[in-house]
Each structure stands twice: as structure tokens, then as C-alpha cells.
């Protein structure tokens, strides 16, 4: 039997622990007998990331930009216990976070619905697709442990040297602080990806943040989505017979539990991380979930939903 030829290499990102074994089985039994497999290999196992000071993660993302498509296995994001177990140089950041930031894409996750596996939520009749923003927020945050009393501020230094300061907290004792960021360009790409995907699949689009509490950070997401929708997609949605709906994240969770499904739920990075697991498990299993990172520049990274 002639094998299928590959003219362009596939970026292969190996992972940690059992994923390395499972990926090898998949290649040996399902791919290599039928495909003349052509891949550019990157070992994203924690030990190799530590050896390369995490440069291998950056290299794999750049290779994805070069070749267009990557397949990634699940990887370990180290905590304090893993630091000791693997004797790490430092607590390396999430490879997914690094790759998603470099590709600046949107993660679309949808349950694989099959007969015989009924959703735990009885009124769910159709798949619920989670569109997760793949840049910034807690995944690219800087953190600091505060040892004792003192003042913590956000400081923005403009190119001309002028400073803008915002008080975070006057600490009277030990604590912790975290600084998050996002980019308008990335939020705009996220919004356009979601609106375009909704049109191509003819599904309603929901979006939710907590703008009533986060009046600048989350409100920026809300405003950008609405501006792009009104300027570029409103008429297209009306012609397609679909709707765009914004609400608060807590209200969205309540509405999702009562809905029948059949829509796309756009979420910020952390919300999408959590809610995609909830939706996947309620539909049957996290392993019965597709996951693809779609970049506005046409790059695709397929990974196991985990």
C-alpha cells in the first residue's frame, strides 16, 4: 500500500509522562503505517525545557509560524513540588501559555458528541463550543511575595519618561501581589476570530466578563467586542440569522446550565481554561474534546484537551 506523502513538515511537540508513551503508540499504530510522516521534532518534556532554559518552547512556536501546523502533547507546568522532583533551575512558565502568546490565537474547544454518552446536564442537546482567548492575563502575569509592611503600586513609564501610578495596596503585613496585562491588538484578533467562527458555523456567540467589577481591564474586552461587532459583523450576523450576546460571567454560567447548547461561548483566558473543562466533563469526558489554537495569521496548533 502506498503511503500518503507529506510535502510540508508538521511541527511535533512531545510532552511529559504518559503522553510521550501514548503519542508514540498513536504514531506507530495509526500514522506511520499509512503516512510517510514528515515532522520537525521538539521535545517539550520538562527535563529538556530545563536543560535549554525553556528555549525549546520558543523554538517550537517559531517553527509553527514557519510551517503553519503543529501537534502538541500535554506538558507539565511545574509547581514547588515539581521544582524539587526534577531539580529545576527555576519554576518554568506554562509551555501552552508561551506558545499561545507567541501565536496570539484563539483556542476553540468543542465536545465530541456520540450516541451512548449522555451529557450530565440533561437539557444539553447540542455541543457548546468554548472560544478561549489565548494571550495574557494570569498566564503571562508577574508575581511577587510581599515580605512585610509597605506600599505596592502599578507604574506605567511612557516613552518620554513620564510616569503614571496607581496604588494597589498598602500592606500592613506579608502578602502576595500579581500584575496582569493584555493587548488591544490581541483582544481585537480574539474578537474577530470568534465572530468569524460563529459565522462559518452559523452559531450564536456569547461573550462574558466581569466588567462591573473590573471597570478598566474587563470593560476593555467588552468595549472592543462591541465596537468590532457593530462596525464589521452586525449586518452579517443578521443575514445569517444568528446573534451576539454579552453578559456577566456569573450570569453566563447560570444561563449555560439552562441552555440547550448549540452556541459558541467566548471567554477570557482563565475563564476559558476552567469552563472548557467543566463543559467537557459534563458532556462526557475531557478526552472527548477537540482543541485547536487558531491564529489570525493562519497558524494552527492542535493539542489534547487537558
Spans of features found by a protein language model:
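N-terminal alpha-helical transmembrane segments of multi-pass membrane transport
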Residues: 2-8, 18-23, 28-52, 61-64
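Short coil/turn connectors at secondary-structure junctions
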Residues: 5-8, 37, 65-69, 117, ...
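Glycine-rich phosphate/diphosphate-binding loop of Rossmann-like nucleotide-binding domains
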Residues: 6-25, 29, 154-247
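Short acidic, glycine/serine/threonine-rich loops at helix termini
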Residues: 22-24, 82-85, 140-145, 216-221, ...
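Active-site rim loops that border cofactor/substrate pockets in soluble metabolic enzymes
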Residues: 43-46, 218-265, 274, 298-300
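N-terminal glycine-rich phosphate/adenylate-binding segment common to multiple enzyme folds
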Residues: 47-159, 163, 270-274
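Glycine-rich phosphate/nucleotide-binding loop
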Residues: 256-306
